[in-house]
Amino acid sequence: MDDADYDNDDVGGDDFDDVDEDVDEDINQEEEADNIEIIAPGGAGGGGVPKSKRITTKYMTKYERARVLGTRALQIAMCAPIMVELDGETDPLQIAMKELKQKKIPIIIRRYLPDHSYEDWSIDELIMVDN
């Protein structure tokens, strides 16, 4: 084949639409934003929805459970004080699970609402369903 056979091919790349870079950045920022936040017990200040006017569920979601366990296991691995009696456990995740089962984890879950307000829930206020 000669080079003349390929002269009529257009490989300039004009077939693709230009993508607005700002739109992609906005989408990525929205995806990275979580609807929950883990807060230390002393860090929950005012400004949220009062306990009597909460609208979210009193059940801990599997995502909140995973985040609480991961956060607490990391704290335990970094030599944080343990809130339960140990029966020979050395794995931080197992210790965190034991603390969660006894509702002794000193963490507050902050749930953000669509109107940018939030609700603070302590671990002992939430109902956990064993899966």
Swiss-Prot record:
Keywords recorded for this protein, A-Z: DNA-directed RNA polymerase, Nucleus, Transcription
PROSITE patterns for the chain: RNA_POL_K_14KD
Disulfide bonds: none
Keyword Magnesium: no
Region spans: Disordered: 1-24
Cited Gene3D superfamilies: 3.90.940.10
Chief location: nucleus
A Pfam short name: RNA_pol_Rpb6
Source organism, top-level taxon: Eukaryota
Annotated GO CC locations: RNA polymerase I complex; RNA polymerase II, core complex; RNA polymerase III complex
Protein name in the entry: DNA-directed RNA polymerases I, II, and III subunit RPABC2
